[in-house]
């Protein structure tokens, strides 16, 4: 009987491991207390600057200034259960785990802070498992756990199955029957990995 290869799991960072949305809202309200804001339960669409810009055009630039500022990514709180889940996943037999994250185009602070966040919260061994890319479709894997609902790039049919991680901006979306969702890190992520393993 042939030995099965390991399951490779790609895990997004912002909105999946690090609480980008809460950090953004808190930072925006702190910096611009007089401006209108979008409560988390009313967030719609992956890009916050687009929703803020629809409220008033100048708000798009203001909200972007929050996540482009030094310290923003470094100081994000972990998503509940994320760190323990990733450590357990990494210890699973025949399972390879990588953190697959897209840096901002305005990357001055973002890139270094993402590395430091991983080292501070998960340890140096996970720094070795960071993949920074603007196009996740070209990264080889079996599963991609990501809060972005529509991931496009050079590859029309990526090697991975996209598991949508529930976040405030996507919780209202109805997925087709062929798509799977992970509601939180308390949800059955182990079952998703094992079902993928069985299909390899």
Swiss-Prot record:
Substrate binds at residues 20, 46, 67, 101, 136. InterPro entries: 5'(3')-deoxyribonucleotidase, HAD-like_sf, HAD_sf. It comes from the Eukaryota. The modification Phosphothreonine is found at residue 102. GO terms for biological process: allantoin metabolic process; amide catabolic process; dCMP catabolic process; deoxyribonucleotide catabolic process; dGMP catabolic process; dTMP catabolic process; dUMP catabolic process; IMP catabolic process. Its EC number is 3.1.3.-. CDD domains: HAD_5-3dNT (cd02587). The lineage of its organism: Eukaryota, Metazoa, Chordata, Craniata, Vertebrata. Its cofactor is Mg(2+). Mg(2+) binds at residues 12, 14, 147. Keywords: Cytoplasm, Hydrolase, Magnesium, Metal-binding, Nucleotide metabolism, Nucleotide-binding, Phosphoprotein. The modification Phosphoserine is found at residue 184. This is 5'(3')-deoxyribonucleotidase, cytosolic type. It comes from Mus musculus.
